[in-house]
Design a protein with these regions (language model features):
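Bergerat-fold GHKL ATPase/HATPase_c domain
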Residues: 1-78, 104-111
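A short acidic-Thr-Gly-centered motif at the start of a beta-strand
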Residues: 6, 80-88
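Acidic ATP/Mg2+-coordinating residue in the GHKL
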Residues: 96
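Glycine-rich G1-box
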Residues: 99-100
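Bergerat-fold ATP-binding/catalytic subdomain of histidine kinases
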Residues: 109-124
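GHKL-type ATPase core
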Residues: 121-267
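GHKL/Bergerat-fold ATPase module in large chromosome/replication-associated machines
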Residues: 241-245, 253-362
């Protein structure tokens, strides 16, 4: 419990780790398909953006350089999120068509805690093989369904071709100090069955049947009754998409959201693509961004080099637009396209900085 319970304090961050894992799986699969060991320091990509450029066709690894049609197509090719359940605590199903895992490897990957299997792969984000379990703290009774199959594109007969599955659950503390989380096994092994197409994917335009399209490999993870929070559970996922874009300013692939809640409103599209904050800034440049921004800068701390960019919203931008872009966040600390820390925009109101008059627009 201490490992799972102490990972993430906010449900949005725990959900992001699932999306990060999907991106890692996609890139890892592409590298292996090219006949390269992901841990090979001479042949494998050394950065995430390099891998995106070489294997996903993303120019310089910048999602915003793709056309809207190509962003949507790339998202559909890689995976997405299906939203079902009710409006209070939606159920999120995260799926991808990446590397996938054989049943025997579940304990050290999809169900693993503090493993080191990713630490030697330079182009992935999730290094510690435990972030995926952080979401369990925000799931009703800790119930999560995991389905995975090793991709035939990377399975060299070293692994089982079966589909593995398990269910996690939270158990009360009882006489223990803390509750425990367990995952389902049979006779000490993750249950499995011979590979067959499973109708567990959404179909574009089909709002009546949430899961009707065949899935064959990769990963499918369903978080039941997820406590995402009042501000992010609205129908059509507009607020959630905006918030995710601040945390994932340049995701490995655009995240496709499929709204399939029966109680959701019909005022907005049931499908949405989240391409990250940098894409939104580029798309809205003519309307809301000061013409000469971003301003680039660089500095060094203890021989470590850092770079940054400063974006300024124009004076006609109102509070609703501020919230859509960055809310109260004034500084984002980014590693591999993911925000790892934030500073509130109140930092610009300090006397020694003296930017109070535009503090909400930086």
């Amino acid at each position: 419990y201490s490992t799972i319970g102490n990972q993430q304090s906010k449900p949005i961050n725990a959900l992001i780790e699932k999306l990060v894992n999907s991106g890692d799986s996609i890139l890892t699969s592409k590298v292996i398909e090219a006949g390269i060991d992901p841990k090979d320091k001479t042949r494998a990509p050394q950065t995430m953006k390099d891998a995106m450029h070489k294997y996903l066709g993303v120019p310089n690894g910048d999602i915003y350089q793709l056309t809207p049609a190509k962003r949507t197509a790339l998202g559909d090719e890689c995976g997405g999120v299906v939203v079902t359940g009710d409006n209070d605590n939606p159920t999120y199903a995260i799926f991808d068509f990446g590397e996938g895992q054989a049943p025997r490897d579940f304990p050290k990957t999809l169900c693993g805690l503090s493993q080191t299997n990713k630490q030697q792969i330079p182009f992935v984000q999730g290094k510690h093989c435990s972030g995926g379990t952080g979401a369990l703290s925000f799931v009703e009774e800790g119930i999560q369904l995991i389905i995975s199959r090793k991709s035939p594109k990377v399975n060299n007969r070293q692994y089982s071709d079966d589909i593995g599955f398990t269910v996690t659950r939270k158990f009360p503390a009882g006489q223990r100090k803390s509750p425990t989380y367990k995952y389902f096994i049979i006779n000490g092994e993750v249950p499995s069955f011979p590979a067959i197409p499973l109708s567990i994917l959404p179909e574009i335009g089909n709002e009546q049947d949430a899961f009707c399209k065949d899935w064959e490999y990769g990963a499918f993870i369903k978080l039941f009754d997820y406590k995402i929070g009042a501000g992010l559970r609205t129908s059509s996922n507009i607020d959630l998409s905006n918030k995710l874009s601040v945390h994932l300013i340049n995701p490995v692939f655009p995240i496709r959201f499929f709204e399939r809640r029966s109680t959701s409103g019909k005022a907005h599209s049931s499908e949405r693509t989240m391409s990250g904050l940098l894409t939104r800034l580029d798309t809205d440049r003519s309307q809301h961004i000061e013409q000469d921004t971003p301003y680039g800068f660089s500095f060094s701390v203890e021989k470590q080099d850092f770079t940054g960019q400063i974006y300024v919203l124009n004076s006609s931008t109102d509070r609703a637009i501020w919230n859509r872009f960055h809310g109260n966040d004034g500084v984002l600390y980014i590693v591999n396209g993911q925000a790892n820390a934030f500073e509130l925009n109140s930092i610009y109101r300090r006397k020694r900085i003296g930017l109070e008059y535009i503090s909400n627009r930086i």
